[in-house]
Amino acid sequence: MPVAALIREEIEIPENVNVEVNGSTVAVKSGAKELKRDLLYPGIEISTEDGKVVIECTFPRKAQTAIVGTYRSHIQNMITGVTDGFEYKLVIRYAHFPMKVSAKGNTVTIDNFLGEKYTRTAKIMDGVTVKVSGEEVIVSGANKEFVGQTAANIEQATKVKGRDTRIFQDGIYIVEKAGKVL
């Protein structure tokens, strides 16, 4: 099977976005939002030219081909994050005990989950905002990984253990990920 001598991926840079490549560090900035990420892998070169981010690899192996695609997705997510941002929606569900959810500082506190006396907490990652309004929790931010991890932390904090999950369906569940309804 013939092997490509060069793999080259190009990403268009929107007008209001500034992308800087310094060694292996890629910085994407738009207005007040800025994301930096270290993208280092042997044999892969990242540069900017003519309003595009270029990712190149000469004589790539299978792993390098995969990493080029991964880096393209990371940079595209960084550009989308600083321009539009990412938003996850979670829904609070309870049947037996009404729970109270509030976001303070860098933690989300969940009181009275399944009638428990102690408070459950979930960590909010850096640069992520959490808004609780009624039965809905909205997690938003520029970094897709941090927004997703914060939403997962909240969902995992209300995991039901030691009870029949067919009966006890109380919890906080992700219903929308970055615009995609689940």
Swiss-Prot record:
SUPFAM superfamilies: Ribosomal protein L6 (SSF56053). One of its GO terms (biological process) is cytoplasmic translation. GO terms for molecular function: rRNA binding; structural constituent of ribosome. PROSITE patterns: RIBOSOMAL_L6_2. This protein binds to the 23S rRNA, and is important in its secondary structure. It is located near the subunit interface in the base of the L7/L12 stalk, and near the tRNA binding site of the peptidyltransferase center. Signal peptide: none annotated. Keywords: Ribonucleoprotein, Ribosomal protein, RNA-binding, rRNA-binding. Belongs to the universal ribosomal protein uL6 family. GO terms for cellular component: cytosolic large ribosomal subunit. Part of the 50S ribosomal subunit. It comes from the Archaea. The lineage of its organism: Archaea, Methanobacteriati, Methanobacteriota, Methanomada group, Methanococci. Transmembrane segments: none annotated. It comes from Methanococcus maripaludis (strain C7 / ATCC BAA-1331). The keyword Heme does not apply. This is Large ribosomal subunit protein uL6. InterPro entries: Ribosomal_uL6-like, Ribosomal_uL6-like_a/b-dom_sf, Ribosomal_uL6_a/b-dom, Ribosomal_uL6_arc, Ribosomal_uL6_CS2. Coiled coil: none annotated. Pfam families: Ribosomal_L6.
